Amino acid sequence: MLGILVPEFPLQTHIFFWREMAALKQMGVPVAMLSTRRPPENACRHEFAAEARRQTHYVYPPSAFGGWRALSYLMKLKETPLSKRLRGVGLVLCAKDLYLHCRRVGIRHIHVHSCADAAHVAAMCNILGGPSYSLTLHGDLPVYGVDHAAKMARAACISCDGPHLKEQIVREVGYPAEKILPNWMGLDTHQFSPSQRSEGQVGRLQLATVARLDACKGHRFAIAAVRKAVDEGCDVRYTLAGEGPERANIERLIQQLRLSDRVQLLGTRGESEVLELLRRSDAFVLSSVGMGEAGPISLMEAMSCGLPAVCSIIGATPQMLTDGVEGMLIPQEDEAKLAAGFVRLAREPALRQSLGAAARRRAVSQFDSAATTRRLLEFIELHTGLSLREGAGSSTVKA
């Protein structure tokens, strides 16, 4: 049995983990869902949320202790201040709970979708005699804390959302490159498929974004760019699906720029509603800034629906689309270039169609979850020597 450990599962952004678990089961892999702590009941609006909570074992609050070797691991962390190491005793308790649960249900390997504290829990579980483990890095290393060498030292292998993260791991941690797999999270490209849309009118453009309302998502730059495009005579409309701490600031900006009739905030939406939004839009916007973004699943969903993307150069986005082929890559915080992209797409419907068709082809060839999940599974089997699929032997895959 393969355990999949995701911190605070399920949250609104966790649908791709559920897709991965479904793909693993279709491949004949018995899967146990694991998590650190139970999130609030309203933290995920997707239809799968209730079933996900029912199937998940939460290691916090823990049920037992006896992890003195794990305590030794914790106290040896070089980059974590002593005060935080002492507070980390709770992680030891969680590691012991995880160890006992793995023994109870027969988990042979744990794959952790985080390089933050959940990675410490898996490492200490292994020290206690628990199963082997692997990790996925979903963003820049600094976002996930410190002591990455300790987290990764015992890991059988590591996957990451893009080649740039593999380079970070090798450079900053010294982990062997041959044990690191750049791999996309993926999505169901059959479900996220284009609608039958006409070429559209010259001068009109419906934009969409699916993202949390956080400062790091750079919504303020996209909204300011909408104002510039409208001032150039284009009929641009913009719909954002997502919720977060920046909502009040975004609402004020919309008012200040006199865009209340053009920019709509939908709040959090489930998967079917996101699909509907994408299918009625002309183009997708990702204006993220700073660190932390890796291979945005929302960008994959939009490309799979045949939408051209106007997208920040951030994380793995240059590996996900080629500027001028599947969309437009824009320097971070560049309102003028965002606006220029909007204006061009508004005035050239044929360009929208050609970029969108290319985006769809790339999504199908690179981002389908069945292929990305199989690639991860084969990599884990290669580096653990385990045959996790019922009735199947190990396979090989290159990093």
Question: What residue spans do the PLM features occupy?
Answer:
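Acidic anion/phosphate-binding donor-loop and adjacent secondary structure
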Residues: 146-147, 170, 178, 187-203, ...
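Carbohydrate-associated surface elements
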Residues: 164, 186
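Conserved donor-binding/catalytic core segment of Leloir-type glycosyltransferases
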Residues: 196-227, 239
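Nucleotide-activated donor-binding/catalytic signature segment of Leloir-type glycosyltransferases, i.e.
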Residues: 251-269
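Short alpha-helical donor nucleotide-sugar binding micro-motif in glycosyltransferases
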Residues: 268-269, 276-281
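Acidic donor-binding loop of glycosyltransferase active sites
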Residues: 279-293, 307
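Short hydrophobic beta-strand element within catalytic cores of glycosyltransferases
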Residues: 308-311, 321
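Conserved acidic donor-binding segment of nucleotide-sugar-dependent glycosyltransferases
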Residues: 323-324, 328-335, 344-349
